[in-house]
UniProtKB/Swiss-Prot annotation:
InterPro entries the UniProt entry points to: GHMP_kinase_C_dom, GHMP_kinase_C_sf, GHMP_kinase_N_dom, IspE, Ribosomal_Su5_D2-typ_SF, Ribsml_uS5_D2-typ_fold_subgr
Gene name for this UniProt entry: ispE
BP term (GO), one: isopentenyl diphosphate biosynthetic process, methylerythritol 4-phosphate pathway
Family: Belongs to the GHMP kinase family. IspE subfamily.
Keyword Nucleotide-binding recorded: yes
Keywords noted in UniProt: ATP-binding, Isoprene biosynthesis, Kinase, Nucleotide-binding, Transferase
UniProt key word Aminoacyl-tRNA synthetase: no
Function according to Swiss-Prot or TrEMBL: Catalyzes the phosphorylation of the position 2 hydroxy group of 4-diphosphocytidyl-2C-methyl-D-erythritol.
Name this protein carries in UniProt: 4-diphosphocytidyl-2-C-methyl-D-erythritol kinase
Length: 288
């Protein structure tokens, strides 16, 4: 029987999120910066020859047919005509629906890894296109670099880690269940922020336009931001519920994590320019 292989599915945080307006198709025009982190879920894959896609792990509240990892594998089959199948096991370490890209990153990892394991030969552009049909955040994980994002977040430009900025992040999940649809549908949401440039980000002239809505409707997020604010400039990632604060070094971030209130969960992770997934892919290609 073919052996299992393990592939990383890294987290992301949104260093800012500006809502520029609403598009004719109902989606919102956004600007954001995706910062990839060196921590995330782990995806175990075992190719099979019968063409079946089987989920071997349980994700509470998500049927196998709706699981993004299963959908990603089947989307790759449909796009390439591959007869390959796969068993999928997800070691879930990122909070579901937390704004750190857990499900999107898992889907991207399945696409990238199976493209290698099944030898389907798609390039990055084609994989990103398949990913976009699964979710707006999937392409940034497929491309595997921290990036400046526009459109609905799918228009990407690689963005280096700021050498003068934070290198380590404490990410906190206060456990709130945020409805992204409710946030973007809120009448009080700011929808007319002016476009900015990367130098504006470096200067700190940024915010998360969704944060005031989430603060007012989900008090747990407001409490987490207040607590993190004691350690630096606290921000919310995406539409939450995860919030974060940056540190220059790992020791400072770990010290703050140790003081985390018991009702919350969190992790410390390093900012990375290149995804751990792509480093794993390069090693797999090198060793055959």
């Amino acid at each position: 029987m073919t052996e299992w292989s393990v592939w990383p599915a890294p987290a992301k945080i949104n260093l800012f999120l500006h809502v520029l307006g609403r598009r004719a198709d109902g989606y919102h025009e956004l600007q954001t910066a995706f910062q990839l982190l060196g921590y995330g879920d782990r995806i175990w894959l075992r190719p099979r020859v019968d063409g079946r896609v089987e989920r071997c792990s349980h994700l509470p509240g998500v049927a196998a047919e709706d699981d993004l990892t299963v959908r990603a594998a089947r989307a790759l089959q449909a796009a390439t005509g591959s007869a390959g199948g796969v068993d999928i096991h997800v070691d879930k370490r990122l909070p579901a629906g937390g704004g750190v890209g857990g499900g999107s990153s898992d889907a991207a990892t399945v696409l990238v890894a199976l493209n290698h394991l099944w030898q389907t030969g798609l390039d990055e552009e084609a994989l990103a296109g398949i990913g976009l049909a699964l979710g707006a955040d999937v392409p940034v994980f497929v491309r595997g670099r921290s990036a400046w994002g526009e459109g609905v977040g799918e228009q990407l430009r690689p963005m280096p880690v700021d050498p003068a900025g934070s290198r380590w992040y404490l990410v906190v999940d206060p456990g709130a269940s945020i409805s992204t649809a409710e946030v973007f549908g809120a009448p009080e949401l700011t929808r007319d922020t002016s476009p900015i440039t990367i130098p504006d980000l470096r200067a700190g002239a940024v915010r998360n336009d969704c944060e005031p809505v989430v603060r007012s409707r989900w008090p747990a997020v407001a409490e987490a931001l207040e607590w993190l604010g004691r350690h630096g400039q606290a921000r919310m990632s995406g539409t939450g519920s995860c919030c974060f604060v940056g540190f220059p070094g790992e020791a400072e971030a770990q010290a703050a994590l140790e003081r985390l209130p018991g009702a919350w969960s969190g992790f410390v992770a390093q900012a990375v320019e290149r995804s751990p997934l792509h480093l794993t892919l390069a090693e797999a290609a090198r060793t055959g």
